[in-house]
Amino acid sequence: MEVERVQDISSSSLLTEAIPLEFIRSEKEQPAITTFRGPTPAIPVVDLSDPDEESVRRAVVKASEEWGLFQVVNHGIPTELIRRLQDVGRKFFELPSSEKESVAKPEDSKDIEGYGTKLQKDPEGKKAWVDHLFHRIWPPSCVNYRFWPKNPPEYREVNEEYAVHVKKLSETLLGILSDGLGLKRDALKEGLGGEMAEYMMKINYYPPCPRPDLALGVPAHTDLSGITLLVPNEVPGLQVFKDDHWFDAEYIPSAVIVHIGDQILRLSNGRYKNVLHRTTVDKEKTRMSWPVFLEPPREKIVGPLPELTGDDNPPKFKPFAFKDYSYRKLNKLPLD
């Protein structure tokens, strides 16, 4: 069965200035109604080049406890490499449909790798205004080049180079977060599977939408991952839920945005917060983003670290193998 891509729906919708009913969100979700219009709190910024390591640790821990979200600058990923990553990703989505479909997620696949549109079950049967491409970029034993675009030709080289940098940055951040819990610096890395932890690249492609007041690029969710490292293009759209409001997230162009995901929430026994976020769309411009999700291997059981629990602080979460946790969450099944 042929899947209709949002990129194609966008092209026809722009002519009529209307969108199909399945993309129109209920009033409790519509951005025009639910976005806070007052003063917006600034997303915490952490400068990783600051020689005062204690100051960096405090900033990361505070942001992770209060927001579950922060942005890092002077993070070590070359600006030119990020530009190239975004360039090859944009060129892929500008290819003819037949070329994009050559790396599509197979219909019977239980994995998420590949070009696609629908990701998870929506309780109201609504659709998100986004197409995506998923593929693992690390470790090499988990990489399946079947889902890496052949065009543009430099796609593979750029993504392999980016994988090295993003792994290094994520391990730096996990070390700081472990330190903030009073644990050995490799505690959270090991809790996520150590060197077998997987890095999943996702490209989100949000084409222009004639009714951005009614639709969402991605509905409200927390990430399945341990942490997520994201670089967006220049079109805003990330919204964060904090203090009972949806706020537009304003970020520094050269920064990497860090989301604390479900697995760090669980490993830290709730000390670090998993950020609830969503994505809005633009009437005239295409928004894109490149999150990399650091995830445990499928069979890895993740639950509160024993060092963080005791009689006075019992475990708040039930341990799950990551594959079971992912299945239950994506299918809206109970997690307790």
Swiss-Prot record:
GO terms, biological process: flavonoid biosynthetic process; response to auxin
Annotated cofactor note: Binds 1 ascorbate molecule per subunit. Binds 1 Fe(2+) ion per subunit.
Outcome after substituting F134A: Reduces activity 7-fold
Needed cofactors: L-ascorbate; Fe(2+)
Matching Pfam families: 2OG-FeII_Oxy, DIOX_N
Disruption phenotype: Accumulation of anthocyanins and glycosylated forms of dihydroflavonols, and drastic reduction of kaempferol, quercitin and favonol glycosides.
Impact when changing H277F: Loss of activity
Tissue expr: Expressed in young seedlings (at protein level). Expressed in roots, emerging leaves, shoot-root transition zone, trichomes, flowers and siliques. In cotyledons, expressed mostly on the adaxial side and only in guard cells on the abaxial side.
Reported effect, R287K: Loss of activity
Disordered: annotated span: 99-118
Domain of life: Eukaryota
Known function: Catalyzes the formation of flavonols from dihydroflavonols. It can act on dihydrokaempferol to produce kaempferol, on dihydroquercetin to produce quercitin and on dihydromyricetin to produce myricetin. In vitro catalyzes the oxidation of both enantiomers of naringenin to give both cis- and trans-dihydrokaempferol.
Protein family according to the UniProt entry: Belongs to the iron/ascorbate-dependent oxidoreductase family.
Designated name of the protein: Flavonol synthase/flavanone 3-hydroxylase
Organism annotation: Arabidopsis thaliana (Mouse-ear cress)
